[in-house]
Structures are given as C-alpha cells and as structure tokens.
C-alpha cells in the first residue's frame, strides 16, 4: 500500500442505528460520506436512507455536530449506486449481526470495491475470519473488523480486528485515520467473540447480575452502588442495560454462550427468566420507554423481582458502605469492602473479585497486553480506571491473595486457579513506565502475536499489533512488557490517556502557585494550566494569568492556556467571589447597602464617574468585588493584546469567564466536544469579563463588512449575540460554537482531545513565524444605541407577557441590552472598548445588588443548578 494513501471518501453500508451514526460522525470530521441502504419499495428509492437521516435529527444527544452537517451525507441504495463504491477508499459494513446477511452483502458489493480500498465490518462480535471467507480471496488482505461503540460520536473506543490475511500496513493506515481524523482511541483486538471491551464489560454486568441476585439487592440499589461511587457512568449497570437495549444485550450474551463453550465461566452466560420475560413483552429499555426502569410522569419506577411489578425507585446505600466508597485509596476501599459484613459491601467485593479473576485468565486470549484491556474498558464502558489499574492500585499481591483464597473457599464464580504469572513473587502490577504486561504462551506453543524469546528484548510481527510489530522488553519467566504503539500518529499525542503506573512529566516549570502552573517543553512556547477544581477562575488564577502573559512576553514566543484534563474552565469561582461580598455582610447588611447605593447615586459611563464613586456609600468588600471584576476585564484584554500570540486550547466546558478568556485569545483550538457559552444569567448577572464587549465588537466588525454608503447598521448582527447571552446558551459542540460566533473562522476544531496540545503548539509556532503583532485597540466601535435597546426590550416584554421569562430575567436582559448596545446613545454611534467594559462592570455590580440575583447565586452554590426566579 502506498505510504501516502489517503481516505478521501467513505461508504457506510447499512443505515440502521449504528450505520447512520457512523456516517454522521464521518461528516463531523469533514469526510465525504455515502450512506447505503436497501431501496425503498415505494416512492423515492432512497426513502429508507432519508428516513434514517431524519431519525438522526431526533436523537439526543445529537450524533451530528451541527444540523447543517446532515446535508453532507449522500444517500445511496444498492440498486442504483453500487458503481459509486469504486470511488471510496474505505467501505464500512454496518448491517444487522447476521453472518448470512453480511456474507450475501459482501458477495454483492465485492465487484465494485476498488483495489486500493479498505473494507471493514462494524460487527460487535462475529468472527472476522469467518466473515472474510465470504470475500473474494484477492480482497481479503484488505478486510478487517472496525468496531465502533455506540454512540459513535461520543464513545472514544474503536476496536480494530485483523483477519489472518489482513495486511499490517493497511491496519496502520486505518488506525491513523481513526485516531487523528475521527478522534478515536484504537485498540487492536484479537478475533475472539465480542473482542475486548464487550467481553470484559459484559462479563462485569453478568457478574453484577449474579451477585445482586445472591445478595437479594434491588436493581436501583445495585445501580446506586456501581455508578459514580466506583468511577463509572451514572447509569451504572441496569440503567445502562436499558440504554443499550435488553434485546441487544441478550444478543451479545448469546454470542458468548454459543462461541465460548470452553470458558470456565460458561455456565454464567445465561440470562434469568425475568430478562426473557421483559424481552418477550417488548419491554426493551429506553427505546420502548420501559425495561428494567420505567418513567411514569416525573418519577422513575423500577422492576421489583419479588412482586414482578414496578415500584418507585428508592435506592438506599448503607452509611458504612457509603463511607468505604468515598475512600479514594483503592487499597483501603477494597479492603473495607471485603472486610465489611454488610451485604452491599460483600456484593461489591464479589463483583470486583470475579472481574479481576476473569481478566487475569482471559488477557492472553483476547488482548495484546494489559494496557489494551484497560483502555478498551475505559473507552468503551466509561470507567475511570480499568480492572487491572484498580487491582494494581489496591496492591497486586494482597488482592491476588484474596482472590486465591476465595477461589479455594468456593466463593468465586469459577474454580479455575489464577494463572501463574499473576502470583509471581516480584509482581507489583501490569503497568510500568516501560510498558504493559503481555502473558507468555506455554512452552512450545505459538502465541497469537508470535514467539517471545528470553533475551533482553525481541521484535514480534503480527498485524494485530500497532505498526505490525512491537518490541517486547524486560521479559519475565512468564511474559514481557509491551511499550505503547510507535505509529507516527501517536507522536501527536504529547500526553496520551494516562494509566496508573505511568509517569506524567509536564515539562519544566516557569512558576507555580497553589492554583496555576506555567511550564514549557523546551520549544519556546509557554503553557499555563489551572490547578483549581473544574479549573474555575479565582482571584489567584487571575493573578497567575497576568504573570504568565508577562513571562511569555519576556521569555517565550507564545502562550497556551491548556488543562491536562477537561474541562477548560467552568468559569468564575462563585464561592470565593460571594464570600468576598458576604463576609462583612453579617453585621452591615451589605446587599441592602449595595442596593441603597445603586438607588441613591445615578450615573452613566458618559458622566465619567467610576463605579467606586457609586459604591462609596457601601461598606465591606464591595470595592474588592469591583476590583476583581475589573481584573477579569484586565486579564481578557491582556490576553487579546499580548505581544505574543495567545492560544486557548479548549476541551469540554468553557463557560462564563472560561469562555471570555477563550474568545479574547489570538486563536482558539477546540476539541469537537467543547461546550462553550456565556452563562452568567443563570446566577443573575451578566458577563463582565469582557464577554459582552467582545461580542458587541464582533457584531460591529461584521456590520462593517456589509456597510452601505458608510451607514453601519449593527443591530441585525448583534441580535444573535444578545440572544446567546441573554438565554445563557451553551454550544453542544465546537462546530455549533462557531455558528454562535464564539469561534471564528480562523479558529481550529480538533477531533482527538489527546492531540489538542500538539495542534495548539503548531498554531502558536505558525503565528509566531509570521512576525506576530497583536491587533490595534479598537477606538471606533459602532453600536446599536438606544434604538437597539428599545427593540430588544420590546421583544423581551413579549416573552415576559407570554411567561417565557421571569421579571428578573427581563431586568437582566435589559442590562445586557444596554451593555451590548453601548448605552443611551444614538444608533451608529462610535465608542471604544473601555466604554463597553465600563458598562459591563456597572451593570454587573448593580445586578449583584439585587435580592433575586443574590438568591440565584446562593441557590447555584448550594444545588449546582440555576434558579429561575
């Protein structure tokens, strides 16, 4: 295969749930995509595909980054458009999990597959080698499995499975495409039933089901125990089954039962009678609105196995068990569970024990190393830590001893002893800085990935491995450690997804405080990372950014704001800000004095009075709060006008102040899954860190481009920015953030978050190489003025009268309108940035003086969600 092989066009065969969503994610990544389905029996031959595309629009969360993207999926059918397959570099089959149906389709399309194309099946567990037999022999070297997890846009994992004929370079090309273009985490799996993630994840669910029945625990109690307390999705176990679909889960378990007859746990690959009863009834979970759970009105009901009726969910976790689960140290957590006699604790230990036992026995059969198994479970099932990571963190030898003791006592689900490599006296785990463990085959046998020598290191060759080969290092008597993939695409991941046992060395420190750290990697680019929870912005963070800009200007060529984990920033530290307001209020009634001061002193920006003049009548920390707001604005402006380019590397939430800092940077580099917005209305204030000013300025710039006879009408361009801020809208993707105006056309969208820092650095280098100069300060910004304010108020009055917004929402909206329209001036008036910043600050402080804003802030701090009062 040519080294410059490019995947330019992709065909997806099958417009079912998975096929349509895979096609959607391909166009999310700007890949030209054809979606095939059987022709409709009546009307438009593409009717079946078009129906599937309509269905995409109804899914929540949305599989498409922007509604406009769906128009880029090209409908096709097997009767009219097979010739179009010749143009495709990658063909993904995603029809139903029937070997006979897939084989028939392969024979039908094979004559139209071009000689350079890759053909891949999205099967979730059927044998890739058996599927390959239906393909012409001369094409089998370009055939493999490519298992996306549902939903494809959001689930990071893709399993890549070769057949015996698959060319190693083909897999390398495909992995590169999946990782960098589609943003996926790829695990090379062996051709065993259900591959890696489903094999372990489904077994974990079966073990949970088994022990829940043994300890007589309700479904809702099990979910309360096996969700966030264990670092797993909130949907936990049985709620996850409802989301997946009980029929789908039954199919996966059936695959294990039929194809894993020699598995020591085979007797447990059965579903209980109640499960079959629900499936036969058509109670399949979320898609049928009833399964193990059922929502009745606003209440969640759960199936009670004792009565066979649904009851109100009322899960209760024992206080003692809850204390154990809150323990962060896995060694203490597992010991606490094993030693606590409460059924809930014994249930959890039993599940951990049997999952560890299963992973240890199956590792060499299903995966190429322990790292692949752990990452597959993390990326495919949403666990914070993989099974081996947890075992290693809890103390390898201690846990191995517990498992062995329980096996000997007949407590485990299978009586097969642990493999010998597990109990090597020197073993402390499976993950090291040098690599992750790979079990050695028995003497005289050939492993699926080749022979392992007893020398210091050896290369093994097999297409199942990344790059077709790997160097195994530090062999033990029973195995070796395999380093991470050496494929060039992974050089773009400066800090790949971290495993316990691996070090993370974040460059050389420039300066560090309790809340920020500035560092560099020796390339002349400074990086600033926050250390606060959710990367919120405190007064100390503001000071840190100002210092970081100074350091960057003095010693570096660029500054990047980047966090090692999402989110980018959840915004201002409300608790710190409000403590600054409220501390002296115990005796002085500060909020009342703020309100009195605002009512007594009438002022405008035009009058030249600073906000401090207004608040002189108020005591306590009001000047401090105003100073913090002014510092927010100073930081935003400093980022915008720094003498070196500033890059916001955004991943996840960028809300409030986090959004404001981003939009002021020279460039934003954002992952597709970035959720950006100015949400201050939720706590009863307006964006005052330059957000209102910046969006008003962007509206003026857009209006300037469409000016007629030197008359600039800002309002048509301002309206959408006002609505975004007044409604607290948050983008559901970086693509939508661009449509909302938070990202500019020059900003970049990245599909793989582990490449974010690499691309941000490349942007910084490119900007610096152009002899970067910051923009000139804007001194003539056209505003919508009093006419714009009146128009926006009229629209809000209609919403108020229609009960779409509250009275306080209206008051907040009026303040936002005044700020963004430039105050009480004529439409088309020209103002400078400081004028708009002063308006921001004034209106923020006046809103902060109101009782209803105070209630919103306090409610948010207490409940973590907005109050609409």
Where in this protein do the model-derived segments appear?
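Short linear segments in intrinsically disordered or otherwise low-structure-confidence regions
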Residues: 465-466
């Amino acid at each position: 295969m040519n080294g410059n092989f490019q995947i330019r066009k992709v065909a997806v065969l099958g417009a079912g749930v998975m096929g349509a969503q895979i096609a959607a994610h391909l166009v999310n990544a700007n890949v030209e995509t054809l979606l095939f389905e059987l022709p409709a029996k009546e009307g438009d031959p593409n009717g079946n595909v078009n129906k599937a595309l309509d269905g995409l629009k109804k899914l929540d969360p949305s599989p498409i980054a922007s509604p406009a993207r769906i128009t880029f999926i090209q409908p096709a059918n097997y009767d009219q458009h097979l010739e179009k397959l010749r143009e495709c570099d990658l063909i993904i089959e995603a029809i139903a999990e029937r070997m006979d149906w897939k084989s028939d389709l392969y024979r039908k399309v094979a004559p139209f597959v071009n000689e350079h194309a890759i053909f891949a099946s999205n099967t979730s567990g059927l044998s890739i080698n058996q599927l390959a037999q239906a393909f012409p022999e001369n094409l089998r070297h370009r055939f493999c499995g490519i298992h996306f997890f549902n939903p494809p846009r959001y689930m990071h994992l893709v399993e890549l499975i070769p057949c015996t004929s698959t060319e190693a370079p083909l897999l390398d090309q495909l992995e590169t495409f999946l990782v960098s273009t589609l943003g996926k985490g790829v695990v090379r799996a062996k051709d065993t039933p259900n591959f890696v993630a489903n094999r372990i994840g489904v077994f974990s669910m079966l073990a949970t089901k088994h022990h829940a029945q043994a300890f007589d625990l309700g479904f809702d109690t099990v979910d309360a125990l096996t969700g966030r307390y264990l670092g797993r999705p909130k949907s936990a176990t049985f709620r996850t089954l409802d989301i997946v679909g009980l029929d789908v889960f039954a199919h996966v378990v059936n695959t294990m039962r039929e194809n894993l007859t020699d598995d020591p746990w085979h007797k447990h690959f059965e579903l209980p009678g109640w499960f079959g009863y629900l499936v036969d009834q058509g109670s399949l979970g979320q898609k049928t609105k009833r399964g193990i759970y059922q929502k009745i009105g606003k209440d969640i009901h759960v199936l009670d196995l004792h009565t066979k009726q649904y009851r109100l969910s009322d899960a209760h976790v024992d206080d003692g068990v809850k204390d154990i689960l809150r323990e962060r140290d896995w060694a203490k957590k597992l010991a606490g569970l094993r030693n606590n006699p409460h059924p809930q604790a014994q249930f959890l230990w039993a599940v951990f024990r049997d999952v560890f036992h299963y992973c240890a026995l199956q590792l060499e059969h299903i995966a190429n190393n322990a790292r692949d198994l752990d990452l597959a479970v993390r990326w495919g099932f949403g666990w914070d830590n993989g099974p081996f990571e947890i075992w290693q963190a809890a103390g390898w030898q201690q846990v191995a001893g517990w498992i062995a003791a329980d096996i000997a006592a007949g407590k485990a689900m299978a009586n097969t002893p642990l493999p010998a490599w597990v109990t090597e006296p020197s073993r402390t785990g499976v993950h090291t800085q040098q690599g992750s463990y790979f079990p050695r085959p028995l003497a005289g046998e050939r492993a699926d990935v080749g022979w392992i020598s007893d020398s210091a290191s050896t290369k093994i060759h097999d297409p199942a491995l990344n790059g077709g080969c790997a160097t195994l290092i530090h062999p033990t008597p029973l195995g070796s450690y395999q380093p991470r993939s050496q494929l060039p695409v992974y050089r773009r991941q400066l800090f790949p997804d971290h495993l316990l046992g691996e070090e993370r060395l974040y460059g050389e420190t420039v300066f560090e405080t309790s809340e920020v750290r500035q560092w560099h990697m020796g390339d002349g680019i400074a990086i600033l990372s926050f250390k606060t929870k959710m990367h919120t912005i405190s007064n100390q963070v503001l000071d840190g950014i100002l210092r970081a800009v100074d350091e960057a200007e003095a010693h570096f060529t660029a500054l990047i704001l980047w966090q090692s984990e999402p989110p980018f920033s959840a915004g201002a530290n409300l608790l710190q800000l409000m403590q600054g307001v409220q501390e002296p209020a115990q005796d002085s009634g500060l909020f009342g004095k703020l309100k009195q001061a605002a009512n007594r002193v009438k002022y405008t920006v035009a009058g030249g009075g600073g906000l401090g003049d207004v608040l002189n009548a108020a005591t306590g920390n009001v000047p401090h709060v105003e100073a913090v707001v002014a510092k927010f604005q100073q930081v935003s402006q400093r980022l915008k006008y720094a003498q070196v380019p500033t890059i916001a590397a955004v991943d996840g939430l960028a809300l409030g102040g986090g959004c404001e800092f981003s939009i002021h940077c020279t460039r934003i580099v954002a992952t597709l899954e970035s959720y950006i917005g100015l949400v201050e209305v939720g706590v009863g204030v307006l964006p005052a860190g330059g957000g209102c000013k910046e969006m008003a300025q962007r509206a003026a710039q857009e209006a300037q481009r469409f000016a007629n006879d030197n008359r600039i009408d800002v309002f048509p361009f301002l309206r959408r920015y006002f609505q975004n801020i007044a409604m607290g809208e948050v983008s559901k993707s970086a693509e939508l953030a661009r449509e909302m105006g938070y990202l500019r056309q020059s900003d970049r969208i990245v599909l793989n978050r582990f490449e974010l820092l690499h691309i941000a650095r490349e942007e910084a280098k490119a900007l610096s190489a152009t002899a970067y100069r910051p923009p000139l300060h804007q001194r003539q910004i056209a505003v919508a003025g009093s006419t714009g304010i009146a128009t926006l108020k009229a629209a809000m009055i209609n919403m108020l009268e229609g009960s779409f917004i509250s009275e306080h929402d209206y008051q907040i909206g009026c303040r936002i309108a005044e700020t963004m329209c430039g105050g009480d001036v004529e439409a088309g008036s020209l103002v400078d940035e400081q004028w708009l910043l002063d308006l921001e600050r004034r209106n923020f402080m006046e809103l902060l003086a109101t009782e209803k804003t105070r209630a919103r802030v306090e409610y948010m701090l207490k409940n973590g969600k907005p109050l609409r009062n």
